[in-house]
Amino acid sequence: MSHHKIELRSVSYTYPDGSRALSDISFTVSHGQSVGILGANGAGKSTLLLLLMGVLRPCSGEILIGDVKMTPATLPDIRKRLGLVFQNPDDQLFMNSIYEDVAFGPRNAKLSGQEVDRRVTEALQTVGIPHLKDRPPYRCSGGEKRAAAIAGILAMQPDVLILDEPTSDLDPKARRRT
């Protein structure tokens, strides 16, 4: 079994106000697969992603990342293997420059300055915005912010990449690159 597998087994989630977001969801995503989840607004897509990241805990069922069941004890190690790009890039970008935002995670992981620079440069090139490295996020378009948020996660080199509305705000060329 691949250590990159994601598995949900009979997962349900109800918000504290009683609104049921997910009911008895089961699926497996294997290493190398790309999966898109489609649904109407309010259908539970973002809730599902928050459950996968351990931000929310299922009311019933279980989530496994690789062969490890997600529990409060395993969550810190699981989170190191997952990268989440939020639906709204403004929730993710908070530093004074795009470079600083993309470098934030690798620096907090205590990587060397040389490794941080290498990862930031590579991530910015991957999403096509190396020319924006010195620009403050508030001076970027929605698509540029989206690309910067994706670069910030790519710089962490997660085993699993989870994207909430990954192509919103991106132009057609940037969508193909993403």
Predicted regions and their residues:
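Helix-to-loop junction immediately C-terminal to a conserved catalytic motif
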Residues: 53
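The feature captures the beta-strand-to-loop junction immediately N-terminal to the Walker
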Residues: 38-40
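Conserved ABC transporter NBD signature motif
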Residues: 61-69, 78
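Conserved catalytic motifs of ABC-family nucleotide-binding domains
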Residues: 157
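Conserved ABC ATPase "signature" region
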Residues: 114-132
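Catalytic Walker B motif of ABC-type/P-loop ATPase nucleotide-binding domains
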Residues: 161-164
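Conserved ABC ATPase signature
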Residues: 136-140, 144
